[in-house]
C-alpha cells in the first residue's frame, strides 16, 4: 500500500442545493417521527429555481404540513430572497407522496428468519469506518473540509461577513508521509457572495477569517495553497445555480472517499432502511474498535437481504494496523453488537426526530448528543475481551 501521497476530500454547506434537499427530506422525516415513531418514510426532494418538489413513499398515522416544513427548512438555511437564488416565502411547493409497497411492508414487518425481529427494508451493503487521524476518529481531509463549511455558515449567520451567501463548497488536500497526515497541501473554498464585494476583499477575508482559524497551524506551511473562488465570481448560487436532489452527496455525508460506500443515501429514510441505520451501526462498530486500540484504522462491511433480519455477511479490514487477527475482531463484533435492523434501532435509539441535524456537515465525526453512533461506550469491553 502506498505510504506517501496526497488525499483530498470535499464538503458542501447547508446552502448547497443538494444539501438543501437532504435537509427538507430529513425535516419531513423528523416531523413524522415526532408523531409516529413506527412510520415508514422514504422522502425525496427536488429543488430548482422557484420550486420544491417532495415525493416518495410514506406510511404513517402522522398528519404533517409538508408545505410549511419545506418553507421553514429553507428559511432556516438562509434563502429568503430570489436575489440570492431562492425565496422560501414565494417558491412553489409540490407534494406527491404515496404509501410503502405492501410487498415490501410484509418483509419488513415480519422477518422470514426470525419472527421476533424486523427484517431489513431492502437488500444492500453498507460500510463503517474509523481511524485515529483526528480526535473524533475520522479521516483528516473530510473532517477539516466539514469544519470549513461550518465556519462559512457561522460567519454568514452571525453577520461577521455579511456579504456571504448560503451556497459554499470546500476541498482539503492532505499530504501523507508514511501513511500519516503530514501537512496541508491545498485548500479550496468557493463561497457564494453579494455582487458588491471584490474578489480581493473576499479572498483575504475567507483566508483569514474562515480558513486559518479552522486548520491546525502545525499542518500549514509556506507551500500550502489557498484557492478562494477560483473562477473569480460566485453570485448566482443555490437552486438557481444548480438543481438539488436528495442523496447526491453520499461521499460528503460519510468519509470523503477514504472508505468504500455501498451506494445508498441516508436522508429522508426511516431507520428500517438499512442504507441508513446499518451505515450508522458500521460507524459505531468501527469507531469502538479503533477507540479500544484494536486497530489504528478499521473498515467494516455488512450486508442484508430484504425481509431477513440477520446480516448476510460481515467483513473487517484493519489495513495491517490490527493488534489482533481480523477474524477475532469479527467474532468480537458478533458477540458485542446486534446488527439486526431492530437490534440497531434499539442499540442506537434511532426512533427519534434527530435526523435534520445529520443532513449537513457530515453524519459522522460529530459530538452532538443526537449522534449516538459516535459514542465509544463499547471500547472498554472490547479491549478487555480482546485481552489487550
From Swiss-Prot:
PROSITE patterns: ADOMET_SYNTHASE_1 (PS00376), ADOMET_SYNTHASE_2 (PS00377). K(+) binds at residue 44. Pfam families: S-AdoMet_synt_C, S-AdoMet_synt_M, S-AdoMet_synt_N. GO terms for molecular function: ATP binding; magnesium ion binding; methionine adenosyltransferase activity. ATP binds at residues 16, 167-169, 233-234, 242, 248-249, 265, 269. Disulfide bonds: none annotated. Catalyzes the formation of S-adenosylmethionine (AdoMet) from methionine and ATP. The overall synthetic reaction is composed of two sequential steps, AdoMet formation and the subsequent tripolyphosphate hydrolysis which occurs prior to release of AdoMet from the enzyme. Homotetramer; dimer of dimers. Belongs to the AdoMet synthase family. This is S-adenosylmethionine synthase. It comes from Thiobacillus denitrificans (strain ATCC 25259 / T1). The lineage of its organism: Bacteria, Pseudomonadati, Pseudomonadota, Betaproteobacteria, Nitrosomonadales.
Amino acid at each position: 500500500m502506498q505510504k506517501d501521497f496526497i488525499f483530498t476530500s470535499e464538503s458542501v454547506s447547508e446552502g448547497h442545493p443538494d444539501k438543501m434537499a437532504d435537509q427538507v427530506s430529513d425535516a419531513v422525516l423528523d416531523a413524522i417521527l415526532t408523531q409516529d415513531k413506527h412510520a415508514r418514510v422514504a422522502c425525496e426532494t427536488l429543488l430548482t429555481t422557484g420550486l420544491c418538489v417532495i415525493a416518495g413513499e410514506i406510511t404513517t398515522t402522522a398528519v404533517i404540513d409538508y408545505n410549511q416544513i419545506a418553507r421553514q427548512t429553507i428559511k432556516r438555511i438562509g434563502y429568503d430572497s430570489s436575489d440570492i437564488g431562492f425565496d422560501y416565502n414565494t417558491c412553489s411547493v409540490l407534494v406527491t407522496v404515496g404509501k410503502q409497497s405492501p410487498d415490501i411492508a410484509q418483509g419488513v414487518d415480519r422477518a422470514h428468519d426470525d419472527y421476533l425481529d424486523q427484517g431489513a427494508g431492502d437488500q444492500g451493503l453498507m460500510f463503517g469506518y474509523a481511524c485515529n487521524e483526528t480526535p473524533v476518529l475520522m479521516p483528516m481531509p473530510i473532517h477539516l473540509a466539514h469544519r470549513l463549511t461550518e465556519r462559512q455558515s457561522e460567519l454568514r449567520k452571525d453577520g461577521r461577513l455579511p456579504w456571504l451567501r448560503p451556497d459554499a463548497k470546500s476541498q482539503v488536500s492532505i499530504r501523507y508521509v508514511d501513511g500519516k497526515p503530514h501537512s496541508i497541501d491545498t485548500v479550496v473554498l468557493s463561497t457564494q457572495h453579494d455582487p458588491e464585494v471584490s474578489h480581493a476583499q473576499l479572498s483575504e477575508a475567507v483566508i483569514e477569517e474562515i480558513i486559518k482559524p479552522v486548520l491546525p497551524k502545525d499542518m500549514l506551511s509556506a507551500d500550502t495553497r489557498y484557492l478562494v473562488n477560483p473562477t473569480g465570481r460566485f453570485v448566482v448560487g443555490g437552486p438557481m445555480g444548480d438543481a438539488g436532489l436528495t442523496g447526491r452527496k453520499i461521499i460528503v455525508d460519510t468519509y470523503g472517499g477514504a472508505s468504500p460506500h455501498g451506494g445508498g443515501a441516508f436522508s429522508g429514510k426511516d431507520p428500517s432502511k438499512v442504507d441508513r441505520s446499518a451505515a450508522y451501526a458500521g460507524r459505531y462498530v468501527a469507531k469502538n474498535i479503533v477507540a479500544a486500540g484494536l486497530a489504528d484504522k478499521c473498515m467494516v462491511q455488512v450486508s442484508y437481504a430484504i425481509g431477513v433480519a440477520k446480516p448476510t455477511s460481515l467483513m473487517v479490514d484493519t489495513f495491517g494496523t490490527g493488534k489482533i487477527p481480523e477474524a477475532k475482531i469479527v467474532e468480537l463484533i458478533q458477540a458485542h453488537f446486534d446488527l439486526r435492523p431492530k437490534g440497531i434501532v434499539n442499540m442506537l435509539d434511532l426512533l427519534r426526530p434527530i435526523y435534520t441535524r445529520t443532513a449537513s456537515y457530515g453524519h459522522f465525526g460529530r459530538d452532538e448528543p443526537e449522534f449516538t453512533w459516535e459514542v465509544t461506550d463499547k471500547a472498554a469491553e472490547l479491549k478487555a475481551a480482546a485481552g489487550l
